[in-house]
Structures are given as structure tokens and as C-alpha cells.
């Protein structure tokens, strides 16, 4: 019985076979525009054969488009192809299981895979790892008997993919991968062949340009289960992608940009992995193997799976190279330890945290033996390079930051070589940071450098007192660093006890002021005066201060107080009222000098002094006024008749009728860049200048308890009056303004102490416009 393709009569065919033919027809017409041209039964009635359990054959002809894939000699044998249906007994559409579209697709794809790959090979296909195809269906070709024993080939690709030629360019490979990923993203289950990109060529491909942005996002889409074995990624950019359960065996990833690329649960054995210099953020390897893989020295291997190395030879690279083993990984080493090689391979502090030291150390502690062996090989190489101290000097910090920690301290070879390096590093730290603040310690410094410095002070206890500036900073950061371990804090506290017991220190701590007031530090509060710095010039002089004060003086802000400490001589507290902070820091405690001077240069009060008292006309007075700003109290007083007269001669022309002259007012605006400022901003500046001149007239500077220079009082009041005219809103109230004005002039029985006025005005400015006050008021008066 022959039935035309346009009107196939399915009435005599069981339901399962109907579904099979319909599915094959639907599946093939999309890929190859093929049509089933005939369906016929053989010698006996199809229904009769199905009833008796015998095999029946349904024949359909392959379209010409498929035949064209085969050699001419094989084409004649492909005219007829059988789909054999075995042991289908149910003719009443009540079979236990119909043939699914998925099973039909697999059958059809298996048929095409075998014929395209082998052309004349017959086989019996079964779904890998599953039960036989429904209804006992198998696929055969060329009218040959089917093989009764089922084999288990790899999961086969879809018909459409295998029936096309392989991509011939990186762009075509990129398109093929994009198509596969989009299908997978859409929910389609890809076969192994769909995910087979072995021998692919992705050279110079920037994946962010071909893939949806969702693949580059954190916790975005994942490239999962793909086979990239023996593929080329040279000069490609795979940044921010996540490859999971992928295979890269024997692939080449040379000069590849892989910033923040994630490889998880993947096979990356036997490949070349060389990052491009434009890789800013290291890739990560999670539960990934790198057996015999060649890796450059800048990598993070925290999630790598190491195994015992085999006897394979080191990889060969262009230009040659030296290598060391890290477990079963090959790490690149320089051919020669030149200056550039030392910096590039060892100086992670100069190379964004990347070096061969950090690469080895990035492995988890369970690989301690492998890490130590690799570091020993590195040290042997350095020792063999006969590097000079000058060559090692720039990388001393990087070396001790890794090698001075466990597990490398357990190696006698490493410790012997590192000892002199650590000594030179410590000497340089003492020389550099005893008189200047340490850089603000980040996590790296707290966890890797501070413990090394503690160990060095422990070995050289004399340095605690000879370099107390550095020692106190180290203890400070160990006790306050949020990333310091408890072990580091405990060791720091123990070392400080040794320091306090030193004869040069102990006389200063039994005065009822130190720590918990009985001579012991109190580490439970940052307000306790636990720190004691020795003078760099006078062994009898020391400074006692709290944790908070020490921190703020080392890293000051405009509001930092520079007198919140005890100055001790022979253990006794002495007044700092008439001591210039800048001179004290320059002579005795230089660790604060740079920070103090930096803040002082931001104070612009001196510009008004230069306007009023030019150095050409009033050189001596100018020096006296400037010198007074460097201390809280002045021994120079300007209340004698000659001084009062001289000051009146200078200030009276600036204050016609007791108010600022227009010309002088414009000079002030110009000096402080306020010409185009708002009235409120001008008023705030004038208010703060008034505060400073009120201080000049007080008993603390040029006045006494009973008298003060009238010209300075009048000038301070004139500045305040102008501020009121410009913006009354900056004052507490009109009543407060009137009270301050009366105090300046002694009117209405007001108390005339300008120290009280200066303090009151200063408190108000600090509360409502602190930045303006901090830009003007001298540090010693703050």
C-alpha cells in the first residue's frame, strides 16, 4: 500500500507510530525542508504484524538536501531508510507510553549523526543512561538489520547543528556560542554536542560585545557545561563572565583579558593561561583543577584543587622560561632576576597586590606543604641570582609581608635567607617613621606588616625607647586596627608592658595620671592616657596622651585640639601655656610636626596681619603679632603708653567713627576672596576675624587682667559690627550682639574681660560655621 505524502492515511497505523512519523516530519521540515514521501507496509498487513508482535518497517525517503552530504557512491544506498518498530502490540491507542517528541528528536539526531560521521555505519540507538526508546523503537538505515545490542554514545547534537559546516572564523564561532547560550537561557536543554566548542577559535573576541549584559552582571547568567577543549582565546576579553562545569583542557588563553572572570567546577588542565596586562581584577578559581597548566605569576588560586604533580616536563614558551611547581601547577619564573623582574615578580605593593608571593600564598592552608615547597624553590632562585641589597631593598616589605608569616617560618631555608632582609626592613622603618606618621593602615598593613614590626621590636627591645615614635604608633594601630587579630593585640599589649618597665619610661607613669591611674594601661577605653612618647632630644621629657588624642594628632582634621596631652618632665606635669606647639613638636616630638604644619598652612589669619602691619613699615610688630599666634599665652604685653600710642597710630585710620573704612573693608574682602561672596559668607569671616582680635586684646596675649590695648579692642568690635550689618542671622540674638559690643567698650557696666568675649564668640562660631573658623583661627588658639 503506497500513500502519498500529502494525504497519508494513518487509519491502519497504531497511535504510537502515528506520533513517530508526525514528529519526524515536523522536526525535519524546519532544518532541511524535507518531506516524508512514502509510507508502506511490507509482505503482511501492518496491523497483523503488530498484533503478533513481529517487526514492521515504515519506509520514508530522505530529501535531496540530506543526501548531498554523502559521497556519490553512497547516495544510491540512501534512497530508502527504515524506521523499525518492534514489538508494538497495542492497536487500540491504549499503549503504556506514547513516543515523546524529545525521544523522536533524539532518534532522528542520532540517525543523522551516524550517517554524517560514518556514512555506512549501522547502529541501534538508545537514550544514554535511560530506558530503551518507547515501544521498542530503534533506528536503522540502508535496509540492513539493526544491531540488537544497544551502545551508549555521547549525547548527540541537534540535527540542525550537525548538519551545518563548522564555523570558519572567530566571528562565526562567537555567533554559534551566542546562539547556544541564548537557547539555553530560554530554557532549552542543550545536548552535549550543542555545548561542544572544542577546537573553537575565539581569538580577539570581546565577549561583552556578543553576549547579553546579563552574562556580565554579578550573579548573572552562567556559561554552564560547555566544552572549550583545545580552543583558542588569544587576545580575547572574557571579563566578568562565569564559566561553570566547563572544560578548557589544552586550550590557549594567552594575553586574555579576564578581569573578575569566575571559573567554577571546571577542568582547566594542560592549558596556557597568561593574563593580559589590562586585566585589572584577578579571575577566581572555585573547585577547579589546573593540572600542568602554565600560569603567570599574578594569579589568585584560593579555590584551586591541587593534586600531586606528575613527571611531565615544564611547558615550552616562546622566548624560553623558568618554572617552579606549585602542586601540579606550573608557575612562571624570570629567566634572570633583573631589576624589572624583581619588581614585577615580587613587589605586590607596587603592582596592585599581585606577585608570585601572593599567588603562592593565595592557596588555602590545607596546601601548606605545597606552598612551602614552592616558596623554597623561589628562595633558591633568588639566592642563586646573587641579588644585591640595593636590588632587594624596594621589595623588602613585600617579602616580609608573606615570608615572615606561617607556614613559611617553619622552613629553615626560608628563615635563614629572610633574616637579614627583615632586619634591613625594620631599620628602614625606624629611620622613616619615627618622626612622621605611618600611613593609615589598611587591612593588608594590619594583617601582614604590623605583626612583622611587633616581631622586630621583640627581637630588638632597645628600639622601643630609641624609636618610641614608631613603637607607639605600631602599638596604637595594633590595638585599634579593626582587622588586627586578637593574637596581634595580645602581643602588642605584652610588648608595651616591657616598654613601660624600661628605666627611661617608668618614672613617667607613677604620677596618678597614666592609664588606670596606678601605672598600668587601661585598654578598655580609648579615653585613658595609655601612651607615653619619649622626647627625641631630652630623656627627661615625655608626652602622655590617650588613644583618641594620639590618633587625631597623627591624622588631624581642622577641629583637632593640639594641646590635649600632658607634658611631663621628670615625671611631673608641666604647663604648656607659654610653649609654642610648633617648637615643641620640632624639638621633642617631630612625629607631629608635619601634620601640625600642614594644618597651620590652611589657617589664613596671617593675611589680615600683613594687610594692617606690612613688614616694610612695621616689621617688628608684624613678627610679634605672628609669633603670638603660635602659642596660647604671650609674655609680650602691649599696654604701655608707647605701645598704646603706636597701635592707635596704625589702627585709627582704619576705623573712622569707630567703623571699618570702605577701603579697608574692600582690602579684607580681596585678601579672603570674598568680593563675590554672599553677605552671610562675608559676615561669617568678619565674625571669626573679630574673634581672633578679641584674643589679641585679652590677657592671654597682649593684654593683662586689668588692662588691654584699646586699638585692638576697638578693631575687634568694628569687625563684629560690620558682620552684624551684613547678616544679623549669624548671631545668636540681638541681645547677645549688644552684650558683646558693650563688653568691648565697657559700656552699661558690662564686664570688660575680652578673654570671656573671645571664648564666647569662638564657641558660637565653632557650632554654627566651624569650617570658616578653622580656616582663620590660629592652631595654637583653637
From Swiss-Prot:
Cross-referenced SUPFAM superfamilies: Pentapeptide repeat-like
GO terms under cellular component: extracellular region; host cell
Gene3D superfamilies assigned to the protein according to its UniProt record, in alphabetical order: E3 ubiquitin-protein ligase SopA, effector protein (NleL), HECT-like ubiquitin ligase, Putative secreted effector protein
Localization, UniProt: Secreted; Host cell
Region (Disordered): 140-170
Highest taxon, organism lineage: Bacteria
Key words, A-Z: Secreted, Transferase, Ubl conjugation, Ubl conjugation pathway, Virulence
Protein name (database record): E3 ubiquitin-protein ligase SopA
Active site: 753 (glycyl thioester intermediate)
Gene Ontology BP annotations: protein ubiquitination
Catalytic activity entry: S-ubiquitinyl-[E2 ubiquitin-conjugating enzyme]-L-cysteine + [acceptor protein]-L-lysine = [E2 ubiquitin-conjugating enzyme]-L-cysteine + N(6)-ubiquitinyl-[acceptor protein]-L-lysine
Family: Belongs to the SopA E3 ligase family.
A molecular function GO annotation: ubiquitin-protein transferase activity
Organismal lineage: Bacteria, Pseudomonadati, Pseudomonadota, Gammaproteobacteria, Enterobacterales
Enzyme Commission no: 2.3.2.26
Record note on modification: Ubiquitinated in the presence of host E1 ubiquitin-activating enzyme, E2 ubiquitin-conjugating enzyme and ubiquitin.
The organism of origin for this protein: Salmonella agona (strain SL483)
Keyword Translocase: no
Location (main, coarse): secreted
Amino acid at each position: 500500500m503506497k500513500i502519498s505524502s500529502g494525504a497519508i492515511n494513518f487509519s491502519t497505523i497504531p497511535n504510537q507510530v502515528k506520533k513517530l512519523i508526525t514528529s519526524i516530519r515536523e522536526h525535519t521540515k524546519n532544518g532541511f525542508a524535507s518531506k516524508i514521501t512514502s509510507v508502506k507496509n511490507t509482505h503482511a498487513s501492518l496491523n497483523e504484524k503488530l498484533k503478533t508482535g513481529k517487526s514492521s518497517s515504515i519506509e520514508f525517503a530522505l530529501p535531496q538536501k540530506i543526501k548531498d552530504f554523502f559521497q556519490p557512491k553512497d547516495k544510491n544506498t540512501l534512497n530508502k531508510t527504515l524506521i523499525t518498530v518492534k514489538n508494538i502490540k497495542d492497536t487500540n491507542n491504549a499503549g503504556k507510553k506514547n513516543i515523546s517528541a524529545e525521544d523522536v528528536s533524539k532518534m532522528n539526531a542520532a540517525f543523522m549523526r551516524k550517517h554524517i560521521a560514518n556514512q555506512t555505519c549501522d547502529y541501534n540507538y538508545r537514550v544514554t543512561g535511560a530506558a530503551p526508546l518507547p515501544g521498542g523503537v530503534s533506528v536503522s538505515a540502508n535496509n540492513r538489520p539493526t544491531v540488537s545490542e544497544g551502545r551508549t554514545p555521547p549525547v548527540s547534537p541537534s540535527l540542525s547543528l550537525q548538519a551545518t559546516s563548522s564555523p570558519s572564523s572567530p566571528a562565526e564561532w562567537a555567533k554559534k556560542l551566542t546562539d547556544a547560550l541564548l537557547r539555553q537561557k530560554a530554557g532549552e536543554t542543550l545536548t552535549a554536542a550543542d555545548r561542544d566548542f572544542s577546537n573553537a577559535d575565539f581569538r580577539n573576541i570581546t565577549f561583552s560585545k556578543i553576549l547579553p549584559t546579563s552574562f556580565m552582571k554579578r550573579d548573572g547568567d552562567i556559561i554552564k557545561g560547555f566544552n572549550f577543549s583545545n580552543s583558542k582565546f588569544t587576545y580575547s576579553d572574557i571579563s566578568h563572565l562565569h564559566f561553570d562545569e566547563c572544560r578548557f583542557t589544552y586550550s590557549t588563553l594567552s594575553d586574555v583579558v579576564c578581569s573578575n572572570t569566575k571559573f567554577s567546577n571546571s577542568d582547566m588542565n594542560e592549558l596556557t593561561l597568561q593574563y593580559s596586562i589590562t586585566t585589572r581584577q584577578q579571575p577566581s578559581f572555585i573547585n577547579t583543577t589546573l593540572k600542568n597548566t602554565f600560569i603567570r605569576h599574578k594569579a589568585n588560586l584560593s579555590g584551586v584543587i591541587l593534586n600531586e604533580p606528575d613527571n611531565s616536563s615544564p611547558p615550552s614558551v616562546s622566548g624560553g622560561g623558568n618554572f617552579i611547581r606549585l602542586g601540579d601547577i606550573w608557575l612562571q619564573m624570570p629567566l634572570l632576576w633583573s631589576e624589572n623582574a624583581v619588581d614585577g615578580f615580587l613587589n605586590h605593593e607596587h603592582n596592585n597586590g599581585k606577585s608570585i608571593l601572593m599567588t603562592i600564598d593565595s592557596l588555602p592552608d590545607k596546601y601548606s606543604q605545597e606552598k612551602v615547597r614552592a616558596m623554597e624553590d623561589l628562595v633558591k632562585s633568588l639566592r642563586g641570582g646573587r641579588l644585591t641589597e640595593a636590588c632587594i631593598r624596594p621589595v623588602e616589605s613585600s617579602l616580609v609581608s608573606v615570608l615572615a608569616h606561617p607556614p613559611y617560618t617553619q622552613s629553615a631555608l626560608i628563615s635563614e635567607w629572610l633574616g637579614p632582609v627583615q632586619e634591613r626592613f625594620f631599620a628602614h622603618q625606624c629611620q622613616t617613621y619615627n618622626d612622621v606618621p605611618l600611613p593609615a593602615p589598611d587591612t593588608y598593613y594590619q594583617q601582614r606588616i604590623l605583626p612583622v614590626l611587633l616581631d622586630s621590636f621583640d627581637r630588638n627591645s632597645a628600639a622601643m625607647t630609641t624609636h618610641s615614635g614608631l613603637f607607639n604608633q605600631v602599638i596604637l594601630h595594633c590595638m585599634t586596627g579593626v582587622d588586627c587579630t586578637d593574637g596581634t593585640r595580645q602581643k602588642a599589649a605584652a610588648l608595651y608592658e616591657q616598654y613601660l618597665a624600661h628605666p627611661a619610661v617608668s618614672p613617667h607613669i607613677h604620677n596618678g595620671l597614666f592609664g588606670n591611674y596606678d601605672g598600668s594601661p587601661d585598654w578598655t577605653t580609648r579615653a585613658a592616657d595609655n601612651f607615653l612618647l619619649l622626647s627625641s632630644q631630652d630623656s627627661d621629657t615625655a608626652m602622655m596622651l590617650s588613644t583618641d588624642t594620639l590618633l587625631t594628632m597623627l591624622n588631624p582634621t581642622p577641629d583637632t585640639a593640639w594641646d590635649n596631652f600632658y607634658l611631663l618632665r621628670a615625671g611631673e606635669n608641666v604647663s604648656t601655656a607659654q610653649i609654642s606647639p610648633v617648637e615643641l613638636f620640632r624639638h621633642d616630638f617631630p612625629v607631629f610636626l608635619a601634620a601640625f604644619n600642614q594644618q597651620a598652612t590652611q589657617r589664613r589669619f596671617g593675611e589680615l596681619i600683613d594687610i594692617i602691619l606690612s613688614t616694610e613699615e612695621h616689621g617688628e610688630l608684624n613678627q610679634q603679632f605672628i609669633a603670638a599666634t603660635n602659642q596660647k599665652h604671650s609674655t609680650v604685653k602691649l599696654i604701655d603708653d608707647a605701645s598704646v600710642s603706636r597701635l592707635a597710630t596704625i589702627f585709627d585710620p582704619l576705623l573712622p567713627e569707630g567703623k571699618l573704612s570702605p577701603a579697608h573693608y574692600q582690602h579684607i574682602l580681596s585678601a579672603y576672596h570674598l568680593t563675590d561672596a554672599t553677605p552671610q559668607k562675608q559676615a561669617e569671616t568678619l565674625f571669626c576675624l573679630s574673634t581672633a582680635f578679641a584674643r589679641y586684646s585679652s590677657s592671654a596675649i597682649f593684654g593683662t587682667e586689668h588692662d588691654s590695648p584699646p586699638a585692638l579692642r576697638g578693631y575687634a568690635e568694628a569687625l563684629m559690627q560690620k558682620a552684624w550689618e551684613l547678616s544679623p542671622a549669624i548671631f545668636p540674638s540681638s541681645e547677645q550682639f549688644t552684650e558683646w559690643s558693650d563688653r568691648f567698650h565697657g559700656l552699661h557696666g558690662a564686664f570688660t574681660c575680652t578673654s570671656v568675649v573671645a571664648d564666647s564668640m569662638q564657641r558660637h562660631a565653632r557650632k554654627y560655621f566651624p569650617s570658616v573658623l578653622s580656616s582663620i583661627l590660629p592652631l595654637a588658639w583653637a
